[in-house]
């Protein structure tokens, strides 16, 4: 496996990242593999040289993080041998502060994710969506503090407009806070809107691109027709 730098960081990742949305609990979605069915695939990924694993707190409502963490602890020789990413934003409960990018929720969410994953830190902590109800200054400072607390090595973003991503980066730069190093955007041969603004922005700024749904949820793999 040839490894590449994630954006302009020094972090080495496999060109293929195993997305963990399909691993967790079939009670959440009927297309999700339960733990026993997930583990052989995760093990095979590690044996093939894949060292990059991306999950989120909301995948199977936390079960994906638990399954991912247990498998990586069992199959990887050392914590240093894999790059672990997770995300924050989506609802994790019924409470008004169980979602979003408020300072409160980010702090609560990173601790909960680390407990479920069974690790002391994640390599990449990503905001899953843009929060229209929280000032970006609050979110970026909270993410900076997560990094400074040693709970995340880098931060990234996912699924937003290019102007929003640029605003977040400018906010962080203006205040001397940690900036995003990666963008996880929706991109494949069917959905190519990201070629208009987001991808050129990221290439210009040295931001790592982690496209989600690269096979268009199976359409490009030939196993779905609708």
Model-derived regions, located:
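N-terminal binding-site loop/beta-alpha segment at the start of enzyme catalytic domains
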Residues: 1-82, 120, 148
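Beta/alpha (TIM)-barrel catalytic core signal, keyed to glycine-rich beta->alpha loops juxtaposed to Asp/Glu
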Residues: 3, 134-226
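Conserved, mostly hydrophobic/aromatic
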Residues: 6, 18, 38, 45, ...
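Short acidic capping loops at alpha-helix termini that bridge into adjacent secondary structure
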Residues: 14-15, 77-82, 86, 120-124, ...
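Active-site mouth loops of central-metabolism enzymes
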Residues: 22-36, 92-107, 128-133
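Short, acidic/polar
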Residues: 31-45, 99-118, 141, 165-170
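Structural motif corresponding to the early beta-alpha repeats
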Residues: 75-101
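Active-site gating/metal-coordination segments in enzymes
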Residues: 93-126, 178, 186, 190-193
């Amino acid at each position: 496996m040839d490894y590449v730098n994630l954006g302009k960081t020094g972090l080495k990742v496999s060109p293929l990242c195993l997305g963990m949305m399909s691993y967790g609990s079939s009670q959440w979605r009927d297309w999700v593999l339960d733990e026993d069915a997930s583990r052989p695939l995760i093990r095979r990924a590690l044996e093939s040289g894949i060292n990059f694993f991306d999950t989120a707190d909301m995948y199977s409502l936390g079960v994906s993080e638990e399954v991912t963490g247990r498998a990586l602890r069992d199959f990887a020789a050392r914590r240093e041998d894999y790059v672990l990413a997770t995300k924050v934003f989506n609802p994790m409960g019924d409470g008004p502060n169980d979602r979003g990018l408020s300072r409160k929720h980010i702090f609560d969410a990173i601790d909960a994710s680390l407990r479920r994953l069974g690790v002391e830190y994640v390599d990449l902590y990503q905001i899953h969506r843009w929060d229209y109800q929280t000032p970006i200054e609050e979110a970026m400072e909270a993410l900076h503090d997560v990094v400074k607390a040693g709970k995340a090595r880098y931060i990234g973003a996912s699924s937003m407009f290019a102007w929003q991503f640029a605003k977040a980066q400018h906010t962080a730069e203006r205040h001397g806070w940690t900036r995003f190093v990666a963008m996880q955007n929706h991109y494949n041969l069917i959905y190519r809107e990201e070629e208009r603004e987001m991808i050129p922005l990221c290439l210009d700024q040295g931001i790592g691109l982690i496209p989600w749904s690269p096979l268009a949820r199976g359409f490009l793999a030939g196993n779905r027709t609708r």
